[in-house]
Amino acid sequence: MPDQESTIKMPNFQLPLVVDVSSSPLQVGIPQTKGWLRIETDPEQAMEGLFRATQKLFQDQPGDLNAIDAVYYCCGPGSTLSLRLAAAFVKTLLWEAKGRISLFQYNALDLAACMTKESINSIQAPFRMGKRFVRTGKVRAIGQKNVLLEEDALEKYPQSLHLLGPRAIAIEIPEAQILKYDLNSVNGLTDLNLVSETAEQPAPYSPEPMTFKKWEGVIPAKK
């Protein structure tokens, strides 16, 4: 029986671009069928960091932004602001290309599962305060994602690998279970195409809308 990689028809693009701001530093890259032509990073998560990294990416390259014919956008999880800025950047590329660019979207948890050779059953990442994303399922595939309370996620999936985030969690994670999120560990388009889906517009990953508790305070009467 053929494996999953051999049964999927690989798109043939001349100059694909990967835009991934799910972690710090942000990463942009030009993937090849197996591996990467080039990857650039930038510690600044704001729009200027994305432009700076992309500009460096295309230095001394035969093509430029106008030659891009595919974009792989990481929808998260990550900083909501950073993901929205990256989405705006990708939308600008799509608008200027006038239909010439194919858009694909992937989840960082799925791509992270391609970054290790270990046999894993789950990967976790920070969500909002007190909650965590948990991805389960096969590697090199689009897995199932759930949002669990932090204590439940850590108790039910004690062997998870973990992506780090800006917030600290209640317990210390063993160093051996921390997974470095690095595009260099991904086998280019071979892995990207297994975890990506086509999209019309980039949309940041947001499984739960933010909720705000109704204020029930009392305004003191004026004297």
Show where each model-derived region lies:
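Phosphate-handling active-site elements
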Residues: 62-65, 94-105
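Buried hydrophobic packing segments
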Residues: 54, 89-93, 113
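A short glycine/serine-rich beta->alpha loop
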Residues: 37-44, 74-80, 175
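Recognition helices and adjacent regulatory flanks at domain boundaries
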Residues: 30-31, 37, 41, 63-66, ...
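Short glycine-rich phosphate-binding loop at a beta-alpha junction
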Residues: 66-76, 160-168
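Phosphate/pyrophosphate-binding loops at sites that engage ATP/ADP/AMP, CoA/4′-phosphopantetheine
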Residues: 54-70, 157-158
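DPxDG-like acidic metal-binding loop motif
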Residues: 70-100
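Oxyanion-binding and handling regions
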Residues: 1-33, 45-52, 103-223
